[in-house]
Amino acid sequence: LKPISLFIIVFILSSSFVFSEEKNPIQLYQEIALSKKLDLNRYWRLLLHYRDPIFFGKSKSEADGNEFFLSPNGKTDPKAELLETISSFFREPLPEEIEETKLHPFCKYPERFRWLDSQLNFDRGLLPKLNCERYKNWIEALNPTSIKLIFASFYLNNPASLFGHNLLKIGSGESSKSEILDYAVNFAANNSPDDSALVYTIKGVMGGYPGVFSIFPYYYKINEYNDMESRDLWEYELNFDEEQSKRITAHIWELGSTHFDYFFFDENCSYQLLSLLEIGNPELKLRDRFNLYTIPSDTVKLILEQEGLVRKKSYRPSLSSKMNQKLFYLEKEERHRVSQYLKGKLELKDLLEFQDPQRQAYMLDAILDANRYQKSLKNYTPQEEQKYRNVLVERSKIDFPPLVEQKPMVSPPENGHGSGRVKISRGESTLGGYSEFAIRAAYHDFLNNDKGYVPFSAIEYFPIVIRKYDFQNNPMVEEFSFFKILSLSPVTSISTPISFFVDLGADSSAIKRDFSFQKTLPYLLAFESEIQPWLIQPAYQKAKNDYEKTYRITNFNSDATGGFTFSNVNSGNSLLWTLSFQLGGKARGNGYYQEGMLVAPQAAIFTGCSYGNWKFGISAQYFVFSIYGYYKDDYKVSPGIRFSPSQNSEIRLEGKLQKYYEEAQLSISLFF
């Protein structure tokens, strides 16, 4: 019996050992995934939007919605999310997941599944039997075969669009369908429509809004950007095949379940769309180029730098660009007659008198575009609607095709200078010689080359100017702005837009102690204290106590003006000019005013002209501080001339005239 008993014991033990070695298939898939280090694979990290810290610490996903992660630690643990994702695909579906009122992970994450299946070769017999009808219907409706990056030009009346905007267009494979019926992918802050521009800007900078992906018919965006906001669209067809396009589209479906904290400067529309392009081609490392801020026009330049990435470029002019193009091709007398008709000073029959059919067609087409543009700005009255219909009827009688689309009258964004700038200057002033260093995070000022930008505009964020006079031991802040915006939209026969200028930050002025009192507010103690920070100490002409002489101080500064502009920027001429008259207010604060801060009326003129790589400009502001009775008015006149040797460099000769102070300087700027 002993040999038999020993055999039975050995058999039982060996059987137990064999059965203990048999593993759940899910565990096997997980082990294979870890052995392949899929949690470290770039594509997995792209799908979950993981980013490594700049210095040290764990990887962290930029997705901020908890519902995007299947593991409780998924936001910071790629391995845990990988294991939980594999396990979830094999989970039995809940009743609501079968009905698809809620999505099973198998249907919720189609691109995660596709990629993991390509790496692990899942057994289809072990997977739940789900049709994923919602996803199938969605992807079939989009039918992705190509991808375009879209750049919508700058819109100065909206803080979200000061730098332009990026979106993607998913091309459909249906040749019979118009391209405008394709779908566009947008990433934007989900803000309240009741938020003011100031609230939007502050919360946008601080990441106070959730950013979400959304999909619209492309014609909807064309209507919004091209027609309602008169923004040109530049389309860049990317060299992605159908399989790559479908990968991107499948991942967009996955992102519908989450949000990203929206940051105005970095994690914005451009940045998040670049992450989608990396899904299409993981070898592209586009986001690595942007650490501090991401700007839509810089995104366009970046994709054009990637060899072979852009297949074709096309231009979709805005309603105002179409109108200006048609007006440009009219004769001078024809333009005058069109203007008179639009002002109600000429009847339609008189407009067309003595004109051949071709010229009549061109004039009527210009009027129709002008009418559409006017309708985008205001609601037409019944009388105006009737006049519009009369023009349509008259145009239908002329059997002559519209003017063939001409060369764009504006430059594409890639032709513009870099958004960042460093500037080195040397100058002479009332206080003697000085050296100056300036740096600007973004974007464009009045004297910069306008190629790729709104002509004669300024959009600046965080420009700072540090100056050291030769007699000083330490430098001081000459100027600083949180933001500075100058919008000079010209008055035309079609519309009368308001031009405006806003600036918030610090500037410098010259002061003489010609009044007897002084008062320092608590927040301005640094200006008076003996231990004041060297960056904001005044620049005296001689000794500190010599109040009879001119000295220069750094002030808190705020400007806001509005008015009207006259210009020929839409004429198509080589020599362009602008002239703007504005009225508004000026706030200036420092420790030498009795009130601490003065608020006074101001009048301003902005004018300039450009030709080729040359530009001349003058801004003149007059501040009526005399309303307080014991202060003198001040003024600031800033002439300048600029030459651009190349796209990303410029040389300037600038001056400044203020009360008690004058200066002139020569500078060299480099853009990046």
Regions found by a protein language model. Name each.
Residues 218-294, 588-591, 654-655:
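Active-site nucleophile-His-acid catalytic modules used for acyl/amide transfer and hydrolysis
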Residues 446-452, 459, 487-495, 534-540, ...:
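Repeated loop/turn-to-beta-strand initiation elements of outer-membrane beta-barrel proteins
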